Amino acid sequence: MQTWQLPEHIADVLPTNARQLESAREQLLALFRVHGYELVQPPLMEYAHSLLTHIDAGLSLKTILVTDRLSGRQLGIRADITPQVARIDAHLLSANQGINRLCYAGPVLHAQPDGLPNMREPLQAGAEMYGFADIRGDIELIDLMLKSMKIADMGKVLLSLGHIGIFRALSDAAHLDAGQSATLLALMQDKDTGSVEAQVKAWKLDGMWAKAFSLLPRLYGGREVLSDARGRLPDLSAVGGALDELQAVCDAFPDNEIHIDLSELRVDNYHTGLLYAAYAADFHDAVARGGRYDGLGGYFGRARPATGFSFDLRSFIGRLPAVERQPAVLVDAEDAEAAREAVEALREQGQCVVIDYGIGHNVSEELAGRLKKTDGVWQIVKR
């Protein structure tokens, strides 16, 4: 194996793309900040039992585990930042009984590639709200997600909505056990209506519940899906409440194209209610995903309402606006010492100054000029 080779699905980010990513990251964090979201930076590695919450068993398949040479305990390299932020809210910020608005932007590592473009080291950025159960919190996060997509230059974005609470309400009312719910959930993900119907028939479910489960995969489309669902799904308070929340989101974004799918349940196991995602042209999958995950912090000692979204900023490289390198001022190597004061003054002003050793350089072809001493004063002489 060549010494320069990297592990599969791991890649370097070279200067041109690195400038794009860092510029977008700075803009995103500035956007989050003016909306009241405070930056947190959880560690890349934690004890495995902290990262692998019992709520999301699937996370263990993504997490790389190592042994800590100091303690002998098992460590995990984070595959998702949300459980870490839930820990921070539950433990380190527990003095605040009100709302915590938190955001982040950092790398995660996956044991296996998670779909296309098959990268194992996403740059996960996101925002989360803890301590507010009202649908207005979800609407605030969706608005922030859509604004984030503008920074990423996504163009027209489709807002997709779902609600796992509807499926769970039907499962509870039909008295399905955990295994049955998991089986039916998997069939829902595949939009396999025939298999759903065959499965509920095999379980000999009451006709009302069998009909409801068979109907869910067919309830998708525009805003009109909600009125259709109200007329066809069982009259359960939890189902009605979920539809009310979906309607509130639709009303909050009258100018956005919205797609509703009541069987779209492709979520991490910790999600509990409203689900939302953003789709853009030329991307095979959602460019951002979010939803409600009430109670996730309970694993760390404080269960609270929570909602948030995240996305892989690195997957946007092909779409991010170009960021040109700043034109540089060159100073001849033999003048560098004498011009030190002038050079540092320019750098403090934000000007890139590069020492020219006479063997070429990788600075921008559009040079700002060369630093020369003229009439006893160091000045930038244009080419």
From Swiss-Prot:
SUPFAM superfamilies: Class II aaRS and biotin synthetases. One of its GO terms (biological process) is histidyl-tRNA aminoacylation. The keyword Cytoplasm applies. Keywords: Amino-acid biosynthesis, Cytoplasm, Histidine biosynthesis. GO terms for molecular function: histidine-tRNA ligase activity. One of its GO terms (cellular component) is cytoplasm. Pfam families: tRNA-synt_His. It comes from the Bacteria. Its main location: cytoplasm. Pathway: Amino-acid biosynthesis; L-histidine biosynthesis; L-histidine from 5-phospho-alpha-D-ribose 1-diphosphate: step 1/9. It is found in: Cytoplasm. InterPro entries: aa-tRNA-synth_II/BPL/LPL (IPR045864), HisRS-like_core (IPR041715), HisRS/HisZ (IPR004516), HisZ (IPR004517). NCBIfam families: PRK12292.1-1, PRK12421.1. This function is generally fulfilled by the C-terminal part of HisG, which is missing in some bacteria such as this one. Required for the first step of histidine biosynthesis. May allow the feedback regulation of ATP phosphoribosyltransferase activity by histidine. Belongs to the class-II aminoacyl-tRNA synthetase family. HisZ subfamily. Heteromultimer composed of HisG and HisZ subunits. This is ATP phosphoribosyltransferase regulatory subunit. The gene is hisZ.
